[in-house]
Regions:
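Substrate-binding pocket helix/loop in short-chain dehydrogenase/reductase
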Residues: 100-102, 106-111, 209
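Short, small/polar-rich loop/turn modules that mediate ligand/substrate recognition or access, typified
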Residues: 85, 177, 182, 239-241
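Active-site helix of classical SDR
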Residues: 125, 161, 169
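Short C-terminal tail/terminal secondary-structure segment
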Residues: 99, 150, 229, 240-260
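Residue(s) in the substrate-gating loop at a strand-loop-helix junction
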Residues: 145
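Conserved glycine-rich cofactor-binding loop
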Residues: 9, 16-17
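Alpha-helical segment proximal to the catalytic Tyr-Lys
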Residues: 130, 174-175, 237
């Protein structure tokens, strides 16, 4: 399957590293124009833009904190100025926060995770849908997680935000469908990125993690990117309102492989 997205205008939030960077590259390789959103490390965003341009693609880098609705409004107006609209939004920006049991969690830290992961996704989806609904086309794809459904001790804000992303995806999909717009999500499992280097670089922790994954390996960012590119293309034109999990079987309760 050779997915093509020529002429499509895409925004990927949190795109200067990890899964976001892989998605941006995947969209560009498929022919889309890509706006790379970042908060910090502008040099990484600029490097990604240059990588895309060297492949004869089109990309721009735009700094914005998605947890700030005013900044999100400015972000979308910059895309309007560059490309006169948007066809694809990838809500990828997210943080997991410091580990702490619920009753020991700092309230401000808890709130920050919700503001970035949930409010940020909503603010961006809201701006995108304002543009997609009148043109009667477009796709919003939210990056969720296996922790949309799997509890994760010490990360109550993160799991709450991802569970909420699942229902936000369904509700916005229901609202937008009559206008020709799809809304869906992808739920990565354990993906080998810098954010979890402390796990995959530690043999003991890695062994424990792999025991939870039936395919017995971590995923690569490019594996998420390939799924995302397909889902936002016309090859998935009948898919909306669902989270597609890309997790090596992590959600299939591997402990029951041999009878529990």
């Amino acid at each position: 399957m050779n997915v093509r997205l020529e002429g499509k205008r895409a925004l990927v939030t949190g795109a200067n590293s990890g899964i976001g960077a892989a998605i941006a590259l995947g969209l560009a390789d498929a022919g889309a124009k890509v706006a790379i959103n970042y908060v910090t490390h502008p040099e990484a965003a600029d490097k990604l833009v240059q990588t895309i341009k060297k492949k004869h693609g089109e990309a721009i880098a735009i700094q914005a904190d998605v947890s700030d609705p005013k900044a999100v409004g400015i972000l979308f107006r910059q895309i309007d100025k560059a490309w006169s609209g948007i066809d694809i939004l990838i809500n990828n920006a997210g943080i997991d926060g410091a580990r702490a049991l619920g009753w020991k969690t700092d309230i401000d830290a808890w709130r920050k995770v919700i503001e970035v992961n949930l409010f940020g996704a909503f603010y961006c989806a809201r701006e995108a849908l304002k543009r997609m609904v009148p043109q009667r086309s477009g796709v919003v794809l939210n990056t969720s997680s296996v922790h949309e459904e799997i509890a994760w001790s010490g990360h109550s804000a993160y799991t709450a935000s991802k569970a909420a992303i699942g229902m936000l995806t369904k509700t916005l999909a229901q609202e937008a469908a009559q206008h020709g717009v799809r809304v869906l999500a992808v739920g990565p499992g354990a993906i080998k990125t810098a954010i979890n280097h402390s796990v995959w670089s530690n043999p003991k922790r890695l062994k424990d993690l792999l025991g939870k994954i039936p395919l017995h390996r971590m995923g690569e960012p490019d594996e998420i990117a390939r799924m995302v590119v397909m889902l936002v293309s016309d090859d998935a034109s009948y898919v909306t309102g669902r989270t597609i999990f890309v997790d090596g079987g992590m959600m299939d309760y591997p402990g029951f492989t041999h009878g529990g």
